[in-house]
Amino acid sequence: MHSRFQAALTTLAADLQAAIAPMLADPHFPALLEADQVATLQHATGLDEDALAFALLPLAAACARPDLSHFNVGAIARGVSGRWYFGGNMEFLGATMQQTVHAEQSAISHAWLRGETSLRAITVNYTPCGHCRQFMNELNSGLALRIHLPGREAHALEHYLPDAFGPKDLEIKTLLMDEQDHGFPVSGDALTQAAIQAANRCHAPYSHSPSGVALELKDGTIFSGSYAENAAFNPTLPPLQGALNLLSLNGYDYPAIQRAILAEKADAALIQWDATVATLKALGCHNIERVLLG
């Protein structure tokens, strides 16, 4: 079991502890629960889905990397597939606050990058900030997404984001988590291919500046992240953050990164290269390459 879960596990009820401990045994537990694992936990505890998600929030919050604030926020995104995806906030020392990943963004991008096609609900241990409410409005589940907070009744996103501005106001039809393929030819070694594939499935309807990042670890594991734009622009999630989020959720640390590749267009309206390099160097990675899409 990864050390991050040890303290959180002791806060859970005894029956839940006993049921989930075997699932956490792998130090690289992927921070997600398959539908059958959720059913197993429900059977062991007698909890319904909503109550179980609340009970598991300490484990999601344990996935956070708030290296600046030391304020752990945890989220659990529930996919239409039945899978549950953990998420936690991330802050990067030596970079800028603009590179931060919020817990809701973490759980949602986790689900998206794992191939989930839509979300039913998200459970969070603190009220979503305005940034996250806007980020969630980019999803294909839209304002109907159910938000569950401790001590409150569940409400749809529209309750937390009245008079919402979103992609439909800009006549965008393809939404975040819809299937997308930008059709760039995939070639090169495994890491290069992963970066191009990530760019191919990115969500960039506003700038038309597709990009993807792939990270290779010292043990050969590869994590990739896709760019996710937002109608309000600022809540956009860069591709590097998607990849770093998966890396961290899977129990790895930044020093494990040995090589990184960014795939983007040379003539794109928005360029990720400088911000990607600056953040990776702040995390100790200097072996960074750029592959041009075309």
Curated annotation (Swiss-Prot):
Membrane-crossing residue ranges in chain numbering: none
GO cellular component terms attached to this protein's record: cytosol
Residues at which Zn(2+) binds: 102, 129, 132
Note describing how the cofactor binds: Binds 1 zinc ion.
Essential cofactor(s): Zn(2+)
Catalysed reaction, written as an equation: cytidine + H2O + H(+) = uridine + NH4(+); 2'-deoxycytidine + H2O + H(+) = 2'-deoxyuridine + NH4(+)
Location of the CMP/dCMP-type deaminase domain: 48-168, 186-294
Name the UniProt record assigns to this protein: Cytidine deaminase
UniProt organism field: Klebsiella pneumoniae subsp. pneumoniae (strain ATCC 700721 / MGH 78578)
Gene behind the chain: cdd
